[in-house]
UniProtKB/Swiss-Prot annotation:
It is found in: Endoplasmic reticulum lumen. It catalyses: Catalyzes the rearrangement of -S-S- bonds in proteins. One of its GO terms (cellular component) is endoplasmic reticulum lumen. Residues 478-502, 512-523 have a biased composition (Basic and acidic residues). It comes from Arthroderma benhamiae (strain ATCC MYA-4681 / CBS 112371) (Trichophyton mentagrophytes). This is Protein disulfide-isomerase. Its EC number is 5.3.4.1. Residues 1-22 form the signal peptide. Its main location: endoplasmic reticulum. Coiled coil: none annotated. The active site is at C59, C62. The lineage of its organism: Eukaryota, Fungi, Dikarya, Ascomycota, Pezizomycotina.
Amino acid sequence: MPGVRSLLLALAGVSLAPAVLAADASTDSSDVHALKTDTFKDFIKEHDLVLAEFYAPWCGHCKALAPEYEKAATELKSKNIQLAKVDCTEEADLCQEYGVEGYPTLKVFRGLDSHKPYNGARKSPAITSYMIKQSLPSVSVVTAENFEEVKSLDKVVVVAFIGEDDKETNKTYTALADSMRDDVLFAGTSSAELAKKEGVSLPAVVLYKEFDDRKDVYDGKFEAEALKAFIKSSSTPLVGEVGPETYSGYMSAGIPLAYIFADTAEEREQYASDFKDLAKKLKGKINFATIDSKAFGAHAANLNLIPEKFPAFAIQDTVSNKKYPFDQEKKLTKQDITKFVEGVIAGDIAPSVKSEAVPETNDGPVTVIVAHTYEEIVMNKDKDVLVEFYAPWCGHCKALAPKYDQLGSLYKDNKDFASKVTIAKVDATANDIPDEIQGFPTIKLFPADDKDKPVEYTGSRTIEDLANFVRDNGKHKVDAYDEKKVEKDGSDVTGKPKDAEAPPKPSDAPESEEKADKEHEEL
């Protein structure tokens, strides 16, 4: 495990790097450093840890992020963690160098040669928590003197009690910490005395948390996968709260999520209390969480509930994306909810499927998919299937439409090509789909005989590039592009990277991708 000194320095916010002048010449009081091409690389070199935002002034999501990013910068400044920003409309080459494809893009830098994307919630507490974890060693060494302080560094802290000579167990724990350091703060000690004080003996793992029973002791075998499952389960409250900071965690948990929609904090507190015993009984099988229906009521439509009719309850299978809405004419009683949840888990209750009507004819160049035909068309094992997931209000989708039709014609008009490749599209706001869609348009290729490994398209949206993508990634290697058969192709129809976060939320449909007047917030 790393030395104690590195942890103490990080806790104290002491800088190990030389002091540098602010990279921007602005005279405002912002704690976010505005970087340009000629200052970016020096700034990254001179700081151990930097979170950089690549943005565009016209981007609506960037504007929403700005105050949260500023709060996080101020909070992290005392810990010598720097937050910076780059305007990609002015520094296009720099943004291209770092693979920026959408706005905002956030990347964590540890020097110029080590950077990775930040994919967490775009809220100050989430950014702050994440960056503090990044500033510490993957496993922080604790002693009797700093133990209480380390336990309170984050909402969840995992501490291992392992003897120094137990090399194999130390190796397993360190590898686990490396793989989960983005989500959880890990610490460790070899002190048998400290272990005894905490009621355990070497080797042991204890998870400390700010909620429920405050701590959980792991009692299984010291194996990575079992430990990982324990940490994921124990770090989730019995009845939590769905919001921007927690949503992605629930979605990646690998088990269903039961939503409890209610308008007031008092109602949500009462429901959390009512269903706590059920949540405890089913822990590890399903997560329970309340959700503020005044702030996030639009999300109810994604679960096939009627928006604005609250309180409400629904279950979402986070793996298959199947939805199970509870009858909104009924009250949320312990008895009825228990029966409903157990029925869903047992497979006795069928999922609700939102689908447009199946088209009477489907003879156009692009095959139209609805939820009821998704399996039949996309999962056809004999064909390479390219699918555009779109939203009717999406400007980039509208711009792509004529080119996508021309692309479809290249295959549809050739009998041999048509037998091997399908070019298709689905309105992801009007149909339940099993795929996780983060922005519009999203284009994926489902190769023949390899449907569980779809390939997402991230290139420029020209007919030639799309056709070549199908050729290069499809099983049949169909080379359909013929410039004589298409109108002037031109360049990428977007003209600029897409505003990357436009999740499929029907009732949130904005008038444009850059600006949206929405009654509800986004998760």
